[in-house]
Each structure stands twice: as structure tokens, then as C-alpha cells.
Amino acid sequence: SIAASVLVLAVRSLGGLQPAELRAYDRLLQQRLPNTTPERLLVIEATEADINRYGYPLPDAVLAQVIERLQPYEPRLIGLDIFRDRPEANSPLAPLLAEQDNLVGLCSGRLGQGDGIAPPPSLPTERLGFSNVVEDHDGVMRRHLLFMTPEVDDPCATEFSLSARLAIQYLDVEGIAPQILPDEQLQLGRAQFAPLQSHSGPYHNLDHWGFQVWLNYADTETFVQQISVSDLLTQNIDLESLENHIVLIGMSAPVSNPTDFFLTPAGANQWPRQQTEGVLLHAQMVNHLLTAALDGQSPIRVWPVGVELVWIAAWCGLGGLVGWRWRRLSMAVIAAGGSVLLLYGIAWGLLNLSWWVPLVPAAIGATLATVGTFASA
């Protein structure tokens, strides 16, 4: 048991188990119990059919029509998830961006060798959010970048992501303001968000720049309504009141705009892999913040490193006990399998309570301890 614990912890400390731990997390995430999400989001998406109809990039006049079509329904906020760094001459969109207080626009921060993308010139900084996201080495979006400090000459001079800007302005109407606590956690309404560190959960030597947290996904089929640009502008769609809604306007055109698609844990578990359009990813991020702040849906949390070590060692001890207790091979195999199933059930149950626990290292350690103890005896 001791040898199994040392071996597993050594391999894990070097990051050798990170890919398997992340894949196990993806699987557990998809198996969680369904959760209900209040209707607060609407996505207006420019589909491939819309691009064929109106052109690419979507003209300012069309975007202005979309915004003006929405305003009578009094949405609390409109987030424009489309870059507009090069305004058209006599653009009807420019005065809307300058004057409509419920309109939030987009830019892209300068990272690494990139140049960044400037915001619309007429948009005030206090209604601006960056589009930058963080993905893991396997390309899957498991983390949520809320804030980052822009460089001095960055054309995207905002510390807020688009999702954080929209959520915080939405919550401001509810009388909720963000607070940074002494332990550097973010207090947002009923929720506290702990920033990821270099060794958080399955991550080892994580580049945790900015303020990153786990992204707690909602059920993809139920959390947001989607309407195409053409349907909004040409059909008699009754949106009723959007008073308590955030409307996101973005692209959903994989041929015309292929770079704005991302791999989520749900898509990574399908074959072939299914990517999600960027506007829906931003909607997931906004929903993540609002459901935590308003509905008490806890952000995903991890144990301190010391508690994880005790957890893994305990399962190694249980595996050793199984190998010592059952001397018939068939019984030892059944008992070891039952232990792993019990471990999986506990990990699943805790993730439903928004706690991630080390499933893979505990399962490997328990199995190695069972085999080693059985063989030595």
C-alpha cells in the first residue's frame, strides 16, 4: 500500500496523470444529474444561411437592425460577440454603440505574439469585454477566464471578460457588487470563486495567469434560447418581455467563420468531436456566473493538496486490505472491482455537490495496492 501510494503520488506530481484525470472529469461532468436553469439568456446567431443572405462580415446595418428590433422588448443587456474594430463609413451601428447603455461590445487582448483586436471606436471602456479564453493542452475548454490585466499598449484596454462584464452589470441591477476577499477569492452574490493555482485539482504546473476558475457548464439543451438573425428580422417572432434577459449576438457559421468554434467537455466525449460556437460558450460563461450568484449553484471546488494526498493514500490502503483479506483470486478481483465502483460513485456524487476529487489516482493506487499485496502474500 505504501509503495503504491508513493508511486502514484510521484507520477501525479510530475503531471503524468493529468490527461487521464481531465478526461475522467469530462465524463463525470456529463453524467451529473440534470439541473434547471432560470431563463435569463437569449442568443441571436448569424448562421451560414444568414451569411449567404446578408454577406460576411455581417454588415453594420444588419447588426443595427437586430439591436433596434430587440430594444422594444427592453433586454437588460445586449452583448455583441462580433468584432467591429473597423467601422464602416456612416455606420448606423456607431451611434447605437456610443449611446445605448445596455449594449456591451467586444475586443481581444494581446497575448504572446498576437496583436489583439481593438474595440469599436465609439464604445466606452466601461461597456467593453475581452473575448480571450483559455483552453487545456487537449483543446478542451474547462476553465473560465474572468479578468486579466492588459498590457500598456494593448488595443483591448479592459480587465473584464465579456462574460464577466455582462454578469457584473446584470447583477448591479440586483444590488450585487463583486468583492475580492482577503484570501483572493471573488465574492459574487451567494457564491465565492476561488482562482485556480498552479496545482489545483488535476492540474499540475498550470499557467494560471489572470483570474481563472472552473467553468461549470449548464445542460446544453435547456439553458438558452437560440434565434437566427433572419428569423428575428423577417418573421413575426414574439419575444414577450426581455426585461430580465441578457441577449448575446454572435456567429454560428462554421464555413464562413471557422475559428470561432471551441471544444467543450460534452463535445470531447462525442465521436466525431462536436465543437460549440463561441457565442454559446460565452453564454455558458455568463450563465455560470449568474446561476452561482443568484441561485446558489456552487462553483466547482477542489480540496487542498494535503487532503488529496490523504484521500489517495486511504484508497491505496483499502486496496491493500482487499488484497490481504481475500486470498482467492476471483474474490479479490470482485472486491477490487467493487472498491473502484464505490470510488466512482463517491466521485460522481461529490461532483453533483460541486466538489472535484482525485478519481484516477485513487483508482490506480487502489488497484496497484491490491495486486501488490495479493502477489506478495
What are these regions (language model features)?
Residues 1-199, 242-328:
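Non-transmembrane functional regions of envelope-associated proteins
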Residues 179-237:
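Substrate-access "cap/lid" subdomains that shape
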Residues 315-361:
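Hydrophobic transmembrane alpha-helices
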Residues 360-377:
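Juxtamembrane or sensor-core-proximal signal-transducing alpha helices
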